[in-house]
Amino acid sequence: MAAALLARACGPVRGALWPRDCRRLHTIFQSVELPETYQMLRQTCRDFAEKELVPIAAQVDKEHRFPEAQVKKMGELGLMAMDVPEELSGAGLDYLAYTIAMEEISRGCASTGVIMSVNNFLYLGPILKFGSKEQKQQWITPFTSGDKVGCFALSEPGNGSDAGAAATTAQADHDSWVLSGTKAWITNAWEASAAVVFASTDRSLQNKGISAFLVPMPTAGLTLGKKEDKLGIRASSTANLIFEDCRIPKENLLGEPGMGFKIAMKTLDMGRIGIASKALGISQAALDCAVNYAENRRAFGVPLTKLQGIQFKLADMALALESARLLTWRAAMLKDNKKNPFIKEPAMAKLAASEAATAITHQAIQILGGMGYVTEMPAERHYRDARITEIYEGTSEIQRLVIAGHLLKSYRS
């Protein structure tokens, strides 16, 4: 199926070999060496990124152009539905595999990484976890091949991090739901063929009155806002979804009425691993750029890498990157081990990785000097792409609140 190349890289996707390797990796604090199957997956994704993504990354960023051909090739590799079981045409891999793949794709092109992340866990994730058998067949299988992508519509113009304050409403009307309101900052909006949309079915219950819906795109009563002109990740579209008496079938309710906030929070916990992995890829690309430049640029008669000030910067960049990578891998492995509750760990991974990405890309530009400030080198693009990782799928401030809340709870129990 679509995961043929991944299967060749990794051997059996499910079965004796893969779970045994997972158990080995769960002793990560004894050994951080990836098992061979994961190493092969990593190399497969790295080779793909270097061949298909690195050559087009600057141009699609400049043109704000969706990398359609590359996304389709990723679908053929199984990268657009990594956690989806094979019976639904997915790759059937685990979270650690996804984390590794996401880093390598984002290392090649951060915009493509976020397109992959949204489709995998913000769109397919909640349907896989909360959808009925019929919904999974209709709303998952067509979105595994790269021919279609989905989006996730939670944020609104007025609520930002306050996801429970949804102003968008869904009214039951005979055999339909009628949606009205505006969703903001929706990634993949202009290319999406479907959306997971959150709307209030009972305003008096606040976040307990929020429900989740599956909305086809395009559909009557739904219009797209302008494509936002963003600082970074410019090859992925971002726009508002505007609902004006948008009528969808009653069976498009995802889960039960009032479950929407729970679905959203569970989904964001999963998605934060993806954003952490994306941040790692950006960081690695920036570090690669800085080292390569510093090795070849001479000052005072020696390569920049002979200067202690540059060495210190590179050391700090590598330290931040490796620390964040371990937190991200740990979060992925805990998810694979079905840790419950699974809230603090992805928050820690996202916070560490996103702030590391901002710091590392900043220092990469500093090392390159004037060359870091021009588009001839990729350092400035990495810097622009990194900044959003501290904002979407929960700001750094929200992650700190989550971490502190769970920390204090553990001390008080």
Swiss-Prot record:
Pathway of action: Lipid metabolism; mitochondrial fatty acid beta-oxidation
Transit peptide: 1-24
Residue numbers bearing the Phosphothreonine modification: T27
Residues annotated to bind substrate: S161, D269, M270, G271, R272, G394
Cofactor annotation remark: Binds 1 FAD per subunit.
Primary subcellular site in the record, as a coarse category: mitochondrion
Active-site residues annotated for this sequence: E393
EC number: 1.3.8.1
UniProt cross-references to SUPFAM superfamilies, sorted A to Z: Acyl-CoA dehydrogenase C-terminal domain-like, Acyl-CoA dehydrogenase NM domain-like
Family: Belongs to the acyl-CoA dehydrogenase family.
Protein name, per record: Short-chain specific acyl-CoA dehydrogenase, mitochondrial
Lineage, broadest ranks: Eukaryota, Metazoa, Chordata, Craniata, Vertebrata
Gene: ACADS
